[in-house]
A protein has these predicted regions:
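Glycine-rich, flexible loop/turn motifs
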Residues: 1, 9, 18, 42, ...
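Arg/Lys-rich, positively charged N-terminal/basic patches that mediate binding to nucleic acids
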Residues: 1-33
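Generic structural signal for well-ordered secondary structure
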Residues: 3, 27-30, 46-50, 68-70
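Amphipathic alpha-helical interface surfaces
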Residues: 6, 30-33, 53, 57, ...
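Conserved phosphate-interacting/catalytic interface
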Residues: 37
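A short, surface-exposed loop/turn module that caps and links secondary-structure elements
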Residues: 41-65
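Enriched for short, Lys/Arg-rich terminal
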Residues: 58, 65-93
Length: 93
């Protein structure tokens, strides 16, 4: 379950409000992935579908994980027990 957002624009999207920060083509897929993240009971639940490409991040994002929205955009978050924290949508390019 999502317990907190790092980005207000990501939270707006999760609440089904439009955000000008993200391209229109990203909204629908991002919302679907945010709903998957919210429904996950354990981190491994996010391995399905394989297109999520669940990754453990390193460097300045150590301690975070990500799932893909598309080749450019990711949802980054911290996972603890059965909850996601500091959820944000990030442009990886």
């Amino acid at each position: 379950m999502i317990k907190g957002f790092r980005c207000k624009e990501t939270e707006k999207l999760f609440l089904r409000r439009r955000s000008s920060r993200f391209p229109a083509g990203v909204h629908r897929i991002a919302l679907r992935k945010l709903l998957l993240l919210d429904a996950a009971e354990k981190l491994e639940d996010l391995r399905i579908p394989p297109g999520n490409r669940l990754e453990k991040l390193a460097g300045n994002r150590q301690g975070q994980h990500s799932i893909r929205i598309n080749d450019q955009w990711r949802i980054c978050f911290r996972w603890s027990e059965s909850d996601a924290y500091e959820v944000e949508i990030v442009d990886y390019h």
